[in-house]
């Protein structure tokens, strides 16, 4: 086999008949497969051992030569070469055809390649190929035209008239002769000449023909190779035949298709030998043509060939296509050895970098390692005995297993793998039972729960794989989410509940006002029952000398609760004391108001600050902020410890708290019935107005809905006022552990209006709540909404998954390729607004980006941040506080790195908080970051209740798809094509339109917009090109024609951000930029100048510039082109890699086109390297990492730590507790 790591690129081309014969190890002459009695392959058949190699390793068919020592010998009795049976996966045969046949891909594809080369329409071509008409090949001196079609009757007539003075044939033979006659150079020359004058349809056809002929000319493929003399037979192990129980056989469909070809071919040979009448021969040739068509692409023309049960047979094309095809099933995703799967279960005792692996599973996964160790230790005498010991599960193997797994991490994966955090590495810990145990904080990243979810486990085998798992994939490293740089390991449920309860404050608890000299003293008091967690106490700052205290209070006494004191023990010793859940307290010392002034009584101080303490227990959102802050100051290791401690404390506290829910925790509302009766009266009034014809049906419906919503809100507000903050349900909702006020309303107030299946609302509300119980009708109405919720979720998951697939495909080859591309361009960013609503603040757009020019204070003119500096949070705050509204930053959109991005234009890697490394696969990360939250977006298109003007706006997932697929948006806005002033807005009642006139410096433009459209401008306003004249969504295709690429990219960026942020999903700009850039990578050539580019050709902007550079250097006229926007699907198919495009969609079309052009795949992206089995060119697969040599390092660096180090620290910590 060839070593895939040895070659640089991969080329595809058309195979000539001689090439097909050179691949072959012999001709398949008979349709037989295997002998029914001996079950051995038949001679000259489809499984012949002489052609394809032996079925048994190192043994010929007759058994004369057996064993490796005879390797390479060809048996003189049976003619089989003695070799490994693996060759039956790679050796090909061929069928020598009695008549040539055309290849259906090139004749039937759109556009028909054969038709374009010969300049014959596909319909006429079909008549010739399938023997319905003759075609004139050489008219001689007759008055016939070349390539003229003749029916059977016409042909006879002409034959009688002219005899042999002309030549006309039918079938593939005729096509081959015509293709041989095509003079490519001459045709190309003529077409280029024609293009100078041609217009309209003629020009389009000429460009298409020129494109194909030029491709043949440049690739070295010959047009006549589209017609085949010999058909290759693929290796037998790729179309196997296996015996089932009961003696029957199951076979691949390909064998049936090959048999049809061989049978028809043999019959045709016999007919030709017998000199059969022409009509019979022609019929047989047509049948042979159809058999080969079915073999190559069954069902492409006419009715497909069917097998038993009317099932269409799977042809060679079907073996490549779709999810079950070769590309996606076997090349991009393989089943792997050393893996298992099981149900997952929670284990709160694990450390953050550990997972529990069931003993039997671990034994099976690490079997070879255990066997090796058993032999090494002398417990077993050889490998066979070791295996036997393991199968018997002897007692002495478990200790060995414990030692074997110590330094070997395992990978855990949960499907669906939506982003890179769905596969993480853990240190295995042996556990009893059969379920895999997961750390509770790892659930968020996996989106896992324990209601029956399953996970797959994989063992990294090589030393490199183990090292990468430990250093790059260990769960303890994955604290921040790559999509927005915020912590993904946020505590939830019990942990949140426990810490919230722990940090609550209560007046009048036992021991209030006691002052302690140290936390240890307070703990003793708590254990003696003198104080409670919620007791407000005084604490000496001297007890925590390393903490930063406010100036002048370093030795003072501050007010806190014992619970908060316990919580603060989790933080590092030199971190601030946190008393209130604010960003200020996380980044600055404790507020001085909590400290006793000299001579002040503690009780008066408690009265002063008690309200602040009572109002500030630590909620879920604050815990998340605290994780981010600890990560910012102390990095991975300390954050990992903090998370584990937070989990421990949360579980302990929620157990101690004893919080439960009972029926009596749901409060009663006194005047609910009156409120409902009042609403009913209002509804009656509205119905009366409708009956009298004062309002329309739509208005009546809208008013009824708003009356009931108002009634529900009123009840909800009352519940919010009467429920006590110590109510267990309130504690759960307020802390963020589970539920919200709406759940409370449904339990205690009323359920309100229910959704109808078509997305509207029922007018009859559910006035009962769950405590009272629902009536039968109310329950029935509720079921519609519940069912709609379920179906919507299922649909959304599928939509979102497909979006992710397209995004990954278009961006997979975007990798950080160098340090700095040296560009002086950038984009100017400001806050994204929607009317008065802030969508994305400037601060979010600056953090982690490099400045493109110095940022100056708008008032003083002083430099705040220099040029080419990566802005961290502090710098971004400074810029925003100084009142700067626009900042020019380095951007992916303006990066000049070919086939990727440079570090400076990308900025910070959000998952680590550091500058991005060369080799980071930022394209895939961007696609995952946008696709993964797709399931959280709505599927709805909002309808505006019949208000004239404002169009229905598309939001959520459909809007994101609309943008990335560059579709014509719903409710399209009209945009101005010129810079100028709005001259007039006139109504045209006859046409039901308005006429908006824009007066520019050079010309004046008028736009006719519908009456219903909301006009966004007034007379006298100044508008720029691309500005909206009416409200709605701009069509990016229109925008790019009126403005430039950058404006279009910025528009798409802002719109995608709106769609996500309106649903409360934060995604960093850079991810959207990566994908937007991919959509605008291509240009369409308008005038080729003196280059060899064809007019109308779509090409990469980088290639276009390179070609122009060459022409300008040699003094020629450069080509001109226009930027175009491609949808992500189209962009993925237009990529330079045919392997990546073929494995995405439209496999046969991509391969047809690539082979005619003789395309060369440079193997730059990830997919194409995975397909051929080469190491991917990202991360440690980059050439700079591959060529590294290990060196002995004398000094141990501080930054790299091992699991053993952490364990040591944890043990020391446990001792001190």
UniProtKB/Swiss-Prot annotation:
One of its GO terms (biological process) is DNA-templated transcription. Gene3D superfamilies: 1.10.132.30, 1.10.150.390, 1.10.1790.20, 1.10.40.90, 2.40.40.20, 2.40.50.100, RNA polymerase II, clamp domain, RNA polymerase Rpb1, domain 3. One of its GO terms (molecular function) is zinc ion binding. Binds 1 Mg(2+) ion per subunit. The keyword Nucleotidyltransferase applies. It catalyses: RNA(n) + a ribonucleoside 5'-triphosphate = RNA(n+1) + diphosphate. Coiled coil: none annotated. Pfam families: RNA_pol_Rpb1_1, RNA_pol_Rpb1_2, RNA_pol_Rpb1_3, RNA_pol_Rpb1_4, RNA_pol_Rpb1_5. SUPFAM superfamilies: beta and beta-prime subunits of DNA dependent RNA-polymerase (SSF64484). The keyword Transcription applies. Its cofactor is Mg(2+); Zn(2+). One of its GO terms (cellular component) is DNA-directed RNA polymerase complex. Keywords: DNA-directed RNA polymerase, Magnesium, Metal-binding, Nucleotidyltransferase, Transcription, Transferase, Zinc. Mg(2+) binds at residues 449, 451, 453. Its EC number is 2.7.7.6. Zn(2+) 1 binds at residues 60, 62, 75, 78. Zn(2+) 2 binds at residues 821, 895, 902, 905. NCBIfam families: rpoC_TIGR (TIGR02386). DNA-dependent RNA polymerase catalyzes the transcription of DNA into RNA using the four ribonucleoside triphosphates as substrates. Belongs to the RNA polymerase beta' chain family. The RNAP catalytic core consists of 2 alpha, 1 beta, 1 beta' and 1 omega subunit. When a sigma factor is associated with the core the holoenzyme is formed, which can initiate transcription. HAMAP family: RNApol_bact_RpoC. This is DNA-directed RNA polymerase subunit beta'. It comes from Lactobacillus acidophilus (strain ATCC 700396 / NCK56 / N2 / NCFM). The gene is rpoC.
């Amino acid at each position: 086999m060839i070593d895939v790591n040895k070659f640089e690129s991969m080329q595809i081309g058309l195979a000539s008949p001689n090439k097909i014969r050179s691949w072959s190890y012999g001709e398949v002459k008979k349709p037989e497969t295997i002998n029914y009695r001996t079950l051995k392959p038949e001679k000259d058949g489809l499984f012949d051992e002489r052609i394809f190699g032996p079925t048994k390793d190192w043994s010929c068919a007759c058994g004369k030569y057996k064993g490796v020592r005879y390797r390479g010998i060809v048996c003189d009795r049976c003619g089989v070469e003695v070799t490994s049976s693996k060759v039956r996966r790679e050796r090909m045969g061929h069928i020598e055809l009695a008549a040539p046949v055309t290849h259906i891909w090139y004749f039937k594809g759109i556009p028909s390649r054969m038709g374009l080369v010969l300049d014959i329409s596909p319909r006429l071509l079909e008549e010739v190929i399938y023997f319905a008409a003759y075609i004139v090949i050489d008219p001689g001196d007759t008055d016939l035209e070349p390539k003229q079609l003749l029916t059977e009757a016409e042909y006879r007539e002409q034959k009688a008239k002219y005899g042999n003075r002309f030549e006309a044939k039918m079938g593939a033979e005729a096509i081959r002769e015509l293709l041989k006659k095509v003079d490519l150079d001459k045709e190309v020359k003529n077409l280029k000449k024609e293009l100078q004058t041609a217009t309209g349809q003629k020009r389009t056809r000429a460009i298409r023909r020129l494109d194909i002929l030029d491709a043949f000319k440049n690739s070295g493929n010959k047009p006549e190779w589209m017609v085949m003399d010999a058909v290759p037979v693929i290796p037998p192990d790729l179309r196997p035949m296996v015996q089932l129980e009961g003696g029957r056989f199951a076979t691949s469909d390909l064998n049936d298709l090959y048999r049809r070809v061989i049978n028809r071919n043999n019959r045709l040979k016999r007919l030709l030998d017998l000199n059969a009448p022409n009509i019979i021969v022609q019929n047989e040739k047509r049948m042979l043509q159809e058999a080969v068509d079915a073999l190559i692409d069954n069902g492409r023309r006419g009715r497909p060939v069917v097998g038993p049960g009317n099932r269409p047979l799977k042809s060679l094309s079907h073996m490549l296509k779709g999810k079950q095809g070769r590309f996606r099933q076997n090349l991009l995703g393989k089943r792997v050895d050393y893996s298992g799967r099981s149900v997952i279960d929670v284990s709160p005792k694990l450390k953050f970098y550990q997972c529990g692996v069931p003993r039997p599973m671990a034994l099976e996964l690490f079997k070879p390692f255990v066997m090796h160790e058993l032999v090494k230790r002398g417990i077993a005498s050889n490998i066979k005995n070791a295996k036997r010991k393991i199968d018997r599960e002897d007692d002495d193997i478990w200790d060995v297993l414990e030692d074997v797994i110590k330094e070997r991490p395992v990978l855990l994966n949960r499907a669906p793998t939506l982003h890179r955090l769905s596969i993480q590495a853990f240190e295995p810990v042996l556990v009893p039972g059969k379920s895999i145990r997961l750390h509770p904080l790892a659930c968020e990243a996996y989106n896992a729960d324990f209601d029956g979810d399953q996970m797959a486990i994989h063992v990294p085998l090589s030393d490199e794989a183990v090292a990468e798992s430990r250093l790059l994939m260990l769960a303890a490293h994955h604290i921040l989410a790559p999509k927005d740089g915020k912590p993904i390991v946020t505590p939830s449920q019990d942990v949140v509940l426990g810490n919230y309860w722990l940090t609550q404050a209560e007046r009048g608890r036992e021991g209030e006002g006691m002052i302690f000299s140290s936390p240890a003293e307070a703990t003793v008091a708590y254990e003696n029952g003198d104080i409670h967690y919620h007791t407000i106490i005084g604490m000496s700052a001297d007890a925590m000398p390393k903490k930063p205290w406010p100036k002048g209070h370093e030795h003072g006494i501050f007010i806190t609760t014992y619970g908060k004191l316990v919580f603060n023990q989790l933080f590092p010793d030199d971190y601030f004391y946190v008393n209130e859940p604010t960003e200020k307290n996380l980044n600055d010392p404790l507020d001085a108001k909590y400290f006793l002034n000299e001579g002040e009584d503690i009780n008066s101080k408690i009265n002063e600050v008690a309200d602040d303490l009572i109002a500030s227990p630590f909620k879920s959102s604050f815990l998340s902020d605290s994780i981010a802050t600890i990560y910012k100051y102390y990095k991975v290791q300390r954050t990992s410890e903090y998370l584990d401690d937070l989990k421990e404390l949360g579980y302990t506290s929620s157990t101690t708290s004893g919080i439960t829910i009972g029926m009596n925790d749901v409060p009663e509302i006194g005047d609910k019935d009156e409120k409902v009766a009042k609403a009913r009266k209002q509804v009656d009034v509205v119905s009366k107005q409708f009956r009298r014809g004062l309002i329309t049906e739509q208005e009546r419906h809208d008013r009824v809905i708003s009356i009931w919503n108002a009634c529900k809100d009123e009840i909800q507000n009352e519940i919010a006022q009467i429920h006590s903050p110590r109510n267990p349900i309130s504690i759960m909702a307020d802390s963020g552990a589970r539920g919200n006020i709406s759940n409370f309303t449904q339990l205690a107030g009323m359920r309100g209006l229910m959704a109808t299946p078509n997305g509207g609302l029922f007018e009859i509300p559910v006035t009962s709540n769950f405590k009272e119980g629902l009536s039968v009708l109310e329950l029935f109405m509720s079921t519609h909404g519940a069912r709609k919720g379920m179906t919507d979720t299922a649909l959304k998951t599928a939509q979102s998954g497909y979006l992710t697939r397209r995004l990954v495909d278009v961006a997979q080859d975007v990798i950080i390729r160098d340090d700095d591309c040296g560009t002086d361009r950038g984009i100017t960013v400001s806050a994204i607004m929607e009317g008065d609503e802030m969508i994305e603040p400037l601060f979010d757009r600056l953090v982690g980006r490099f400045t493109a020019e110095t940022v100056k204070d708008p008032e003083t003119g002083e430099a705040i941040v220099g040029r080419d500096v990566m802005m961290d949070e502090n710098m971004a705050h400074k810029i925003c506080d100084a009142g700067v509204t626009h900042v020019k930053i380095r951007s992916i959109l303006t990066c000049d790195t070919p086939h990727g991005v440079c570090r400076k234009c990308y900025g910070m890697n959000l998952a680590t908080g550091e500058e991005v490394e060369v080799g980071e696969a930022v394209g895939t990360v961007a696609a995952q970051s946008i696709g993964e939250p797709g399931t959280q977006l709505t599927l709805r298109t909002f309808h505006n209740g019949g208000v004239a003007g404002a169009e229905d706006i598309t939001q959520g997932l459909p809007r994101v798809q609309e943008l990335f697929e560059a579709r014509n948006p719903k409710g399209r806005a009209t945009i101005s094509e010129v810079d100028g002033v709005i001259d007039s807005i006139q109504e045209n009642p006859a046409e039901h339109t308005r006429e908006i006139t824009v007066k520019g410096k050079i010309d004046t433009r008028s736009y006719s917009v519908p009456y219903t459209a909301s006009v966004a401008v007034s007379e006298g306003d100044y508008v720029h090109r691309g500005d909206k004249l009416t409200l709605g969504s701009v069509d990016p295709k229109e925008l790019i024609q009126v403005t430039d690429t950058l404006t279009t990219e910025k528009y798409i960026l802002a719109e995608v951000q709106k769609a996500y942020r309106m649903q409360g999903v934060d995604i960093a700009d850079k991810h959207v930029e990566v994908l937007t850039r991919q959509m605008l990578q291509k240009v369409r050539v308008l005038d080729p100048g003196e280059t060899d580019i064809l007019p109308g050709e779509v090409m990469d902007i980088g290639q276009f510039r390179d070609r122009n550079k060459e022409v300008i250097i040699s003094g020629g006229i450069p080509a001109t082109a226009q930027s175009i926007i491609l949808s992500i699907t189209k962009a993925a198919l237009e990529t330079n890699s045919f392997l990546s495009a073929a494995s995405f969609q439209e496999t046969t079309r991509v391969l047809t086109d690539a082979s005619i052009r003789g395309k060369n795949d440079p193997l730059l992206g990830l997919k194409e390297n995975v397909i051929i089995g080469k190491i991917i060119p990202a991360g440690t697969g980059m050439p700079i990492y591959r060529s590294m040599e290990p060196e002995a390092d004398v000094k141990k660096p501080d930054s790299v730590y091992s699991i053993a180090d952490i364990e040591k620290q944890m043990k020391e910590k446990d001792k001190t507790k």
